[in-house]
From Swiss-Prot:
InterPro entries: Mal/L-sulf/L-lact_DH-like_ah (IPR043144), Mal/L-sulf/L-lact_DH-like_NADP (IPR043143), Mal/L-sulfo/L-lacto_DH-like_sf (IPR036111), Malate/L-lactate_DH-like (IPR003767). Belongs to the LDH2/MDH2 oxidoreductase family. Its main location: cytoplasm. This is Uncharacterized oxidoreductase YjmC. It comes from Bacillus subtilis (strain 168). PANTHER family: MALATE DEHYDROGENASE, OXIDOREDUCTASE-RELATED.
Length: 337
């Protein structure tokens, strides 16, 4: 058996111990562990605790600042920039969203870019935070070049995910978190850890040919052809250029040069519906929209219609009770001394 099930709290503690042992301060270790386990609870294992070993190696090599002290500067009535001091992206995105939420509550909208950052994990964590405050949340981050542009064979863009969180009155928030590539590269890593093949179309080899062996994947494809390609560029503009960071092939690689600071950028936004329309009416209409989608007749071969993020929310409810599934090799690393 190549996977093992453990309690979420045990996973958090094990991740915290590993990061703490690598010199990371307590506050940041707790936040990184929380974001990673959030992903595993939702069965998004590509962004879960499997990344711990990489983070430890990068900390020890000097590629992440273990004592980072992020600094926020308000640049306008509803805008700001957070300098992440080359610390963890999980911490920087979280702080950036906190500032965006604060501005949105007071002024209707808050937009923050984060610079001098690193990998930030699942964006759903941060937009969920806004939705829990009955605000609309949006987050984007660029990554190093691993995705070929539509019609090309050389990787120039990153997986460049984008996420939205929209609150409802009684229903769970609408959470959309997606890579603009066909899949996140973490899914390739997960398949490698679990010894599984991948669906054709996820990735290509050095010749640009589609492969199902995850060990042969050198680049990913965009989702939806030119549509995903276009959205990927938008993400690089917002989280790269707008943040004063690099883009595409000029970004330090995640899995090479572990001693290099990655200097990633992120973009987060929070919107207060009450500055645009009646707050209760908005939340009630969101309930109605979700309900109509869920009650719509399913197509042949489908059990029912789900809204984006709903399946992950159901996984989270179950996994909080039953535990999260992780690769045995990942668990063995977490338990090692």
């Amino acid at each position: 058996m190549k996977t093992i099930t453990i309690a979420a709290e045990e996973a958090k503690e094990l991740v915290w111990q590993k990061l703490d042992g690598a010199g990371l301060n307590e506050r940041d270790a707790e936040k990184v562990a929380d974001v990673l386990v959030h992903a595993d609870l939702r069965n998004v294992h590509s962004h879960g605790v499997l990344h711990t070993e990489h983070y430890v190696n990068r900390l020890l090599a000097g590629g992440i600042n273990p004592g980072a002290q992020p600094v926020f500067k308000e640049t306008g009535p509803v805008t700001g920039v957070l300098d992440g001091d080359d610390g963890f992206g999980h911490v920087n995105c979280d702080m950036a969203m906190d500032h965006a939420i604060d501005m949105a509550k007071k002024k209707g909208v808050g937009m923050v870019t984060a610079v001098n950052s690193s990998h930030c994990g699942a964006l759903s964590y941060f937009v969920q935070k806004a939705a829990d405050e009955k605000l609309i949340g949006m987050a984007m981050t660029h990554t190093d070049s691993i995705v070929v542009p539509f019609g090309g064979r050389t990787p120039i863009l990153g997986t460049n995910p984008i996420a939205y969180g929209v609150p409802a009155k009684h229903k769970k928030p609408f959470i959309l978190d997606m890579a603009t590539s066909k899949v996140a590269f973490g899914k390739i890593l997960q398949a490698r850890e679990e010894g599984k093949e991948i669906p054709e179309g996820w990735g290509v080899d050095e010749n640009g040919e589609a492969v199902t062996d995850p060990d042969k994947v050198v680049s990913l494809s965009t989702f939806g052809g030119p549509k995903g390609y276009g959205l990927s560029i938008v993400v690089d503009v917002f989280s790269g250029l707008l943040a004063g960071a690099a883009f595409g092939p000029h970004i330090a690689k995640m899995y090479n040069g572990l001693d290099q600071k990655r200097k990633l950028g992120h973009y987060v936004c929070a919107i207060n519906p009450s500055f645009f329309t009646d707050w209760d009416t908005f939340l009630e209409q969101m309930d109605a929209m979700i309900d109509e989608l869920q009650q719509s007749p399913p197509a042949v071969g489908f059990e029912r219609v789900y809204v984006p993020g709903e399946i992950e929310q159901l996984h989270e409810e179950r996994n909080k009770k039953n535990g999260i599934s992780i690769a045995r090799s990942v668990y063995e690393f977490l338990k090692s001394r």
